Amino acid sequence: DVETMLQMLYLYFTNINKDEKSFANLIEQYKVSLKNRSLSPEKALQDSLTATLYGHNPRLKPVEVADLQHVSYDRILEMAKERTANAAAWTFTIIGNFDEATLRPLICQYIASLPSQKNIVKGKRVTFLQKGKIDNTFKRKMETPKATSFKIWFNEDMPYTLENDIRASIAGQVLSMVYLKKIREDAGAAYTCGAQATASIEDDYHLIQMLGYCPMKPEKKELALSIMEGAVKDMTQTVDADMVAKIKAVMLKQADDVAKTNGYWNGVIGVYRKYGIDTHTDYKKLVSAQTPQTISDFMKEFLKSNNYITVTMLPDESK
């Protein structure tokens, strides 16, 4: 019930306790999961992708078994207590079916009474995407030879708007359809492939990012890679009208479905509270207004940044 939820929230801030047994179990779980991590080609690709995107940022270095001995449970608890010692900068959003008259005194009892002070430390960004054109192609021994490529295009200059968010989503879905048709169906170069694009905002940083991926047949890798890159460039000139129409129909239906969930409204309220951007009211109208030309124009502007990263893992078939 709501009161139990708020009681747990209060304890989360004020009564962080040590549980040595649970911590020891967690470390053992990590040891098991990390033990054979280095043998996995998929993990090697994932690590290479992260390292290439963020310039080998030490904060994003993958955890290894040897690192676990340096994990201090006391320091973890200390950090948790530091972050919960001042509730002044926290915002609590409560969404759902509740009676305000019943809820208000509970908020006063369990949230308003949390420890707070005026000294608020603002967070700062510590990870940065590497700009320009970067290609990281490497070979890896694997039991079942296969080639896999990720291609990422991004733009940090275009503003975050609801319309840019919608256009990015449509563009990514169109690209995914094009990949499936040209790479899998027409060329027979892969069993699966796809793409997606997102727009995001965090404080004063905004990012539009498009990602294409393709686990491809090694003997057809050049063809698949060529299609992956060429399809993005082609979208600056022409975008398939039938694909756009199908995507819009799905997005409009999904809009009605997700509007019935608490998670959706939590996101809408969060963006409006932080940035004054209403992502709900005009959403369906803006989706309906998109055309192949608006998506093509979006792609032209998006690709002006010339930020394009490729990470490709090939099978090492040397003896």
Predicted stretch roles:
Residues Q46-D47, Y73-Y110:
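Non-catalytic, conformational "gating/processing" segments within enzyme and secreted inhibitor domains
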Residues N119-V178, K182:
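His/Glu-based metal-binding/catalytic segments typifying zinc-dependent metallopeptidases
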Residues E100-R104, D203-D204, K319:
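Extracytoplasmic/secreted cell-surface and envelope-processing proteins
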Residues D165-S169, Q173, M177-K181, S226, ...:
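Feature representing long, continuous alpha-helical segments
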Residues R83-A87, E143-P145, F302-S305:
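Extracellular/periplasmic catalytic domains that process cell-envelope and extracellular macromolecules
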Residues L77-E82, I134-K141, F298-K300:
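Short, surface-exposed beta-strand/loop micro-motifs that present aromatic residues
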Residues D1-T14, L26-K35, S40-H70, A88-I95, ...:
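M16 family metallopeptidases and their MPP-like homologs
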Residues L106-V121:
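Glycine-centered hinge/linker elements that transmit conformational signals in sensory
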